[in-house]
């Protein structure tokens, strides 16, 4: 029975210029705000964010929860704890993302992992792309951005920017025994909430455009089972919060939680919700000065 390990809706390679739909809104100061200026400011913020985040470690708590047809919990969740950090290399080549998340497994269902214990299909990868990297100045070409007005997030005014991929590309499918990881480049659609004055990102929601059929190789097919899987839904929502640090004193807006819901017809894990929460942020000091 095939289990879907990871579904992503962005491609791996991006070039230089963003495609922008320049629809004007007004910020809280009454100044005109267009998508092109907003996206440029947010992209600059993401660069500064990565420069700071690379000196931070956080505990990531993951709950992998099977869901019933009505999307209620179905059985027990698998719970994992990781120590997580961001690696930032602005000079990375196009085929190797400049920002990555690296994980060290600390516990499985509250117990230390065994030395030879292999990860299960739905467990997070030890290394994965950082989700804001597509907003960097040289990584936006395959997206269209559109200003979507103002809103409020946790009492803060937020400008909203909608985005979607320019055109779909061929799915990238990687099989490992009965596990499969799927990237769906060119099928992303989403919304960014950002502070109109500081460009701090407060929330990021993303899903896929349309349904996607994935052929199941004969080796992975169940007896009498389907020859394909259909990805019907792959939605994620990232929420951010302010975190205060000392020595030196600094407040950063960092991830608080990520919730991901996937529905994959004809798979071994047809409905799953993965919840990630981030606690115990702490900074490790290197010989380099923290970039302002």
Q: Where are these predicted regions, by residue range?
A:
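A general, composition-driven signal for non-globular sequence regions
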Residues: 4-7, 20-21, 35
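Bacterial N-terminal signal peptides
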Residues: 12-27
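Structured extracytoplasmic
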Residues: 29-189, 196-203, 207-292
């Amino acid at each position: 029975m095939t289990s879907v390990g990871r579904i992503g809706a962005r491609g791996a390679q991006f070039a230089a210029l963003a495609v922008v739909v320049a629809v004007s809104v007004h910020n809280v100061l009454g100044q005109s705000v267009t998508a092109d200026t907003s996206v440029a400011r947010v992209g600059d913020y993401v660069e500064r964010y990565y420069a700071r985040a690379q000196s931070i470690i956080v505990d990531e708590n993951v709950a992998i929860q099977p869901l019933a047809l009505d999307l209620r919990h179905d059985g027990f969740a698998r719970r994992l704890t990781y120590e997580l950090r961001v690696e930032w290399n602005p000079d990375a080549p196009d085929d190797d993302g400049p920002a990555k998340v690296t994980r060290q497994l600390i516990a499985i269902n509250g117990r230390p992992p065994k030395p030879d214990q292999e990860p299960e299909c739905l467990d997070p990868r030890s290394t994965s792309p950082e989700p804001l990297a597509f907003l960097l100045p040289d990584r936006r070409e395959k997206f269209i951005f559109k200003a979507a007005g103002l809103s409020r997030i946790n009492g803060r005014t937020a400008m909203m920017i909608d985005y979607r991929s320019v055109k779909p590309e061929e799915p990238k499918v990687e099989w490992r025994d009965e596990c499969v990881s799927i990237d769906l480049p060119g099928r992303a659609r989403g919304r960014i909430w950002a502070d109109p004055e500081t460009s701090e990102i407060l929330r990021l929601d993303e899903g896929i455009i349309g349904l996607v059929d994935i052929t199941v190789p004969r080796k992975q097919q169940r007896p009498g089972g389907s020859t394909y899987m259909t990805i019907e839904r792959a939605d994620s929502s990232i929420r951010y919060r302010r975190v205060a640090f000392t020595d030196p004193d600094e407040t950063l807006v960092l991830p608080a939680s990520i919730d991901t819901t996937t529905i994959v017809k004809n798979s071994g894990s047809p409905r799953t919700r993965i919840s990630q929460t981030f606690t115990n942020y702490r900074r490790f000091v290197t010989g380099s000065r923290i970039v302002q």
